[in-house]
Amino acid sequence: MIQLFRVVISEQIIDNSEPVKCKRRTTLGKSLLFSRVLYREWWPATYCSRVSGYRDILPELDLVLWLIKADDRALSVDEYFWRHILQCGHQQVLFVVTQADKTEPCHEWDMAGIQPSPAQAQNIREKTEAVFRLFRPVHPVVAVSARTGWELDTLVSALMTALPDHAASPLMTRLQDELRTESVRSQAREQFTGAVDRIFDTAESVCIASVARTVLRAVRDTVVSVARAVWNWIFF
């Protein structure tokens, strides 16, 4: 079933509000996954028993993480929700195949090397491809094992890419230290400056006076450069 995670609520570029909210469903490994990825608690939301409850909250979300267990073969409810309830929000969804270490043959998982056996790797590949064929999402399907830590860095990279630029840096500050790599920090910084840059696009589009547009263009590069320079000070 669908899992909704509120990564950033506000449309502001800098936001320290509740970073993550979840719509509950048991046995998917949500708690373990997020405790391995985030160093702060995530806030579980109340269960939505009505379709309208999901529809009401979707516009508030920057990203939806849709969790599917690696050994889950019954996806008819997920498919119905995707096609009939989610409607126009497909670009907000990142599919994650969880508990990859339980993929058959599960006894072959390499605990020392923290990786699947060749047979498991093939089955995981087939699972992610099957999920992609069924849902045709905008973003690639990611497979992870929260219990072993396998591919959590890939999940973080996918999250950063899928998030709107204004939401990447607030999420990055809440990652576990080992996942907040220089590459992730660099990506968040560039997305932050990109968000600042687009503010000028919006401002120019609503400016009627040519003088005002000229002034905006003159200060644009300076402001974006300053934003890049002070990024570390703002978020750390």
Swiss-Prot record:
It comes from Escherichia coli (strain K12). The lineage of its organism: Bacteria, Pseudomonadati, Pseudomonadota, Gammaproteobacteria, Enterobacterales. Gene3D superfamilies: P-loop containing nucleotide triphosphate hydrolases. InterPro entries: P-loop_NTPase (IPR027417). To E.coli YfjP and YkfA. GO terms for cellular component: cytoplasm; cytosol. One of its GO terms (biological process) is tRNA methylation. This is Putative uncharacterized protein YeeP. It comes from the Bacteria.
